[in-house]
From Swiss-Prot:
Reactions catalysed according to its record: H2O2 + AH2 = A + 2 H2O; 2 H2O2 = O2 + 2 H2O
EC number: 1.11.1.21
Gene: katG
Record-linked InterPro entries: Catalase_peroxidase, Haem_peroxidase, Haem_peroxidase_sf, Peroxidases_AS
Official protein name in the record: Catalase-peroxidase
């Protein structure tokens, strides 16, 4: 019998293959709380090991040699994927743009900070066709420099060098992005089940861009921002302009930056649609092993050079697509445009008439001239009144355009890196930028013991001290490294007025802590954290444990002038399960909102559990609510939350929306009240396993120490100077 006709063998393992397609736990119980987002990026998946320190490795990187190699790459055309016009500048700019452009300010997720473009789903998005080829072109450089340069940094740098080679004076560059080693599980890209599903499903009303579902910042599944062919693929530049304004705002960009990035992104390179997308192989994740992680290979033709298919739109935007100039605006405003279609059938705009010398040359044969094109997004810059005014200003002042673009590009590629203190390398700009959330250096020379003594004599309760410190620190987002206690922005607009910060209580507490800061030379940021630490120490002492909470001085105080109030609006907590509070009813359950906050804070599931139990018995609930305070000794850091939760002497009865009573099984008498967040600690099998550990008689001190460790982790989450 021929080998190819042998019957399939039975699985050699009785229970079946471990990679079989049987239902997962989450498929069997889709409504169960999925803690996977707290378990992702485990150090076991990192091949570099726990001892590897990327920032130390960066110190040995020959930056100038790396940049020289990247510059050489830009014109080193490869036969397997030849460069357009002999230059990869357009391609590399696109690889970088499509990595950084996935960032959204709403939750800080996406962006270029992790090298996530290497993994699903981004590596296989329809909008990312052939970015896989760009990364393969970069591989020899990554191979050469090894651990000294992360994929995330290399991808971000490649586009920056591309613009430099094209002739732009770039604004600068910072290293410091660390790679992840598996797809991110915490990022919500939408609930559609098909690529490029109509936009309607993610809008309340697709004609009103502001109704785009939060936290999304792209109009369709698999796109970076807008559909280049128009809303739902139907050309309408004005409607596209409205979607651009909203999606770019959700990336943290204003109108001027939007125009600059759109035009600058299309000043170099071209779009590819000279063929049929039906001839392309599957995307990288779906392709067979023989493709070795490459996707979209043309199976019925050359599929390279002038015959490449990417977006389906075909053509260049400018007369000289490898050169940084004002050619985009010249082309856009010099001609009248008509709607047409590419060879791949995509909608695009073509000039009604154009002089031969204005046409770009063919990517392979300079003796052939081709027709330039504009997308619906490009036409939006001409027809939208606000975009048009900005575009004309750029058209008439190339130096201004170049400066705005260079700054916007820097912002695009660095927005998710956090504060400037995380930047590494010789090309870090000296200028402080408002979107970097600058914070002055704080003092470390004051008398910490004297500050604690004043806090102890202040008359503030343990609950006041702990709640204020928690509220100050909980804004931290590990996604884009924003927020946190450093800077003490909780005392500034908009944070001082956020409902979740209990403005009246906050004002009262700050009126006591701020004079202490002035009198001692400490920053108010340090005093807020130190006060919270003191409160935790007192709670531990009340439980019988004399444990010092670690404290590192040096936080600074940001000013109102250093704070872009509007940009902090997305950091406002709409719920905080740690303080047992939700602003209003949401489609998402309170326990899922808790999970999201824990993930942004960088917490593990055990840390989430220990913090919930500790904050409840300390009495740190929003508004002093009694829900979940399962103790007769509030203010003491006891294990009572867990012992009560696991005690079968009690039953649990729903009493209203998100509310429950804990009743004595024998008498039926109500003992405590609780919320869904409280009860999920005992109902979820994983969280209950942790709760049982802390309910054990021999783990009372362990609980106190674990709580203090998790508390300190949150207080120091934004102390990048301590890393």
């Amino acid at each position: 019998m021929d080998a190819t006709s042998k019957p399939a063998g039975k699985c050699p393992v009785m229970h079946g293959g471990n990679t079989a397609s049987g239902k997962s736990v989450t498929e069997w119980w889709p409504n169960a709380l999925n803690l996977d987002i707290l378990h992702q990026h485990d150090t076991k998946t990192n091949p570099l090991g726990t001892s590897f320190n990327y920032r130390e490795a960066l110190k040995t990187l020959d930056v100038e040699a790396l940049k020289a190699d990247l510059r050489a790459l830009m014109t080193d055309s490869q036969e397997w994927w030849p460069a357009d016009w002999g230059s990869y500048v357009g391609m590399m700019a696109r690889v970088t743009w499509h990595a950084a452009g996935s960032y959204r300010v709403t939750d800080g997720r996406g962006g270029a900070n992790t090298g996530n473009q290497r993994f699903a789903p981004l590596n296989s998005w329809p909008d990312n066709v052939n970015t896989d080829k760009g990364r393969r072109l970069l591989w020899p450089i990554k191979k050469k420099y090894g651990n000294k340069i992360s994929w995330a940094d290399l991808i971000a740098l490649a586009g920056t060098i591309a613009y430099d080679v094209a002739g732009l004076k770039t604004f600068g560059f910072a290293f410091g992005r660390e790679d992840i080693w598996a797809p991110e599980k915490d990022t919500y890209w939408g609930d559609e089940k098909e690529w490029l599903a109509p936009s309607d499903g993610r809008y309340g009303d697709v004609s009103k861009p502001e109704t785009l579902e939060n936290p999304l910042a792209a109009v369709q599944m698999g796109l970076i921002y807008v559909n280049p062919e128009g809303v739902n693929g139907k050309s309408d530049p004005l409607a596209t302009a409205a979607q651009m304004r909203e999606t770019f705002a959700r990336m943290g960009m204003d109108d001027e930056e939007t125009v600059a990035l759109t035009a600058g992104g299309h000043t170099i390179g071209k779009s590819h649609g000279n063929g049929s997308a039906a001839n392309l192989s599957p995307d990288p994740e779906a392709a067979g092993p023989e493709y070795q992680g490459l996707g979209w290979i043309n199976t019925k033709g050359r599929g390279i050079g002038r015959d490449t298919v990417v977006s389906g739109i075909e053509g260049a935007w400018t007369s000289e697509p490898t050169k940084w100039d004002n050619g985009f605006f010249d082309m856009l405003f010099k001609h009248e445009w008509t709607l047409t279609h590419s060879p791949a059938g995509a909608s695009q705009w073509a000039p009604i008439t154009i002089a031969e010398e204005d046409k770009p040359v063919d990517v392979e044969d300079a003796s052939i001239r081709t027709i330039p094109m504009m997308t619906d997004a490009d036409m939006a810059l001409k027809v939208d009144p606000i975009y048009r005014e900005i575009s004309l200003k750029f058209k008439d002042d190339q130096d201004h355009f170049s400066d705005v673009f260079a700054r916007a590009w820097f912002k695009l590629t660095h927005r998710d890196m956090g504060p400037k203190s995380r930047y590494v390398g010789p090309d870090v700009p000296a200028e402080d930028l408002i979107w970097q959330d600058p914070i002055p250096a704080g003092s470390t020379s004051y008398d910490v013991a004297a500050v604690k003594a004043k806090i102890a004599a202040s008359g503030l309760s343990v609950a006041d001290l702990v709640s204020t410190a928690w509220d100050s620190a909980r804004t931290f987002r590990g996604s884009d490294k924003r927020g946190g206690a450093n800077g003490a922005r909780i005392r500034l607009a908009p944070q001082k007025d956020w409902e979740g910060n209990e403005p009246a209580r906050l004002s009262r507490v700050l009126s006591v802590l701020e004079p202490i800061a002035r009198e001692t030379g400490a920053s108010i940021a340090d005093v807020i954290v130190l006060a919270g630490n003191y409160g935790v120490e007192q709670a531990a002492k009340a439980a019988g444990f004399d444990i010092a909470v670690p404290f590192a001085a040096g936080r600074g105080d940001a000013s109102a002038e250093q704070t872009d109030a509007d940009s902090f609006a997305p950091l406002e907590p709409l719920a905080d399960g740690f303080r047992n509070w939700v602003k209003k009813d949401y489609v998402v359950s309170p326990e899922e909102l808790l999970l999201d906050r824990a993930q942004l804070l960088g917490l593990t599931a055990p840390e989430l559990t220990v913090l919930i139990g500790g904050l409840r018995v300390i009495g740190a609930n929003y508004g002093g609510a009694a829900h979940g305070v399962f103790t007769d000794k509030p203010g003491a850091l006891t294990t009572d939350f867990f012992t009560t939760l696991t005690d079968m002497a009690y039953s649990w009865v729903p009493t209203g929306n998100n509310l429950y009573e804990i009743r004595d099984r024998k008498t039926g008498a109500a003992r405590y009240s609780a919320t869904r967040v409280d009860l999920v600690i005992g109902s979820n099998s994983i969280l209950r396993a942790y709760a049982e550990v802390y309910a054990q008689d021999d783990n009372r001190e362990k609980f106190a120490r674990d709580f203090i460790a998790a508390w300190t982790k949150v207080m120091n989450a934004d102390r990048f100077d301590l890393i």
